[in-house]
């Protein structure tokens, strides 16, 4: 079945997609803003492929939901579903550089060997106290509470440290009914609280002077360059859709400065 979508705000409807409640929460919380479709080429709104073997083919679907509104350059969500063992919710909220705001990032991935769960308000300028002073004192208590209820995901690479906050929520879970319960009863409310905090920060953010806005832009460029260069989904997407489509998707949709 080919999924047709009119624009980037068309509903995400993937059968048995574990992250549907998270998508619904996102749309509900963003309803307080006057959101508009973010321009996304039709080739990236919906893409399908068949992988696996001839005896056991697997249908893979990738859908993109994207919006823009006041203070936000882009909200984009990459949604992937492939059989029983592949399910992806990859969300990035990219603020305009006219405001001292972090990125909002959520990357929830289900693979055959388990769930990888990452959630953060990611700084554009981690070492800049002005950029972080209104965020971290409110974010860290949320992190400490929810991380105490989740197993740690382990160390993050040194090169990635500048792009994560002390409030980085990071966990790995095996595929099990217990993990499904953890996702619905712990991860989902954690996602809601992180997103609510981000929305509060949006409401109070004030426009910056030009010099400061340019400094934020440089930090955003470094972040986007790192994310686009190191995107762990690149190999998987290349396997499904080919290198040309994948590189265009990464640079024109997922991480577009």
Curated annotation (Swiss-Prot):
Q: Example GO molecular function term?
A: phycoerythrobilin:ferredoxin oxidoreductase activity
Which NCBIfam families does this entry report, sorted A to Z? PRK13249.1
The Enzyme Commission number assigned here is 1.3.7.3
Name of the gene this protein is made from: pebB
State the UniProt keywords alphabetically.
Answer: Oxidoreductase
This protein's name: Phycoerythrobilin:ferredoxin oxidoreductase
The function of this protein is:
Catalyzes the two-electron reduction of the C2 and C3(1) diene system of 15,16-dihydrobiliverdin.
Q: Which Pfam families match?
A: Fe_bilin_red
Q: Name one GO biological process term.
A: phytochromobilin biosynthetic process
């Amino acid at each position: 079945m080919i999924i047709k979508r009119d624009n980037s705000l068309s509903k995400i409807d993937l059968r048995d997609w574990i992250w549907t409640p998270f998508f619904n929460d996102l749309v509900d919380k963003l309803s307080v803003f006057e959101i508009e479709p973010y321009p996304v080429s039709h080739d990236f709104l919906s893409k399908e492929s068949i992988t696996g073997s001839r005896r056991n083919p697997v249908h893979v679907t990738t859908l993109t939901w994207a919006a823009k509104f006041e203070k936000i350059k882009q909200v984009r969500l990459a949604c992937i579903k492939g059989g029983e063992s592949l399910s992806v919710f990859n969300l990035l909220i990219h603020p305009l550089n006219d405001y001292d705001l972090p990125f909002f990032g959520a990357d929830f991935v289900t693979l055959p060997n388990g769930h990888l769960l990452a959630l953060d308000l990611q700084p554009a300028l981690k070492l800049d106290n002005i950029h972080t002073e209104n965020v971290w004192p409110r974010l860290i208590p949320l992190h400490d509470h929810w991380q105490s209820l989740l197993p740690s995901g382990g160390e993050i690479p040194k090169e990635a440290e500048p792009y994560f906050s002390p409030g980085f929520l990071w966990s790995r879970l095996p595929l099990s009914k217990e993990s499904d319960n953890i996702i619905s009863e712990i991860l989902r409310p954690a996602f809601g609280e992180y997103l609510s905090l981000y929305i509060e920060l949006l409401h109070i953010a004030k426009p910056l002077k030009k010099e400061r806005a340019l400094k934020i832009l440089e930090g955003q460029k470094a972040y986007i360059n790192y994310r686009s260069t190191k995107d762990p989904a690149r190999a998987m997407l290349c396997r499904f859709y080919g290198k040309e489509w994948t590189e265009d998707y990464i640079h024109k949709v997922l991480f577009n400065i």
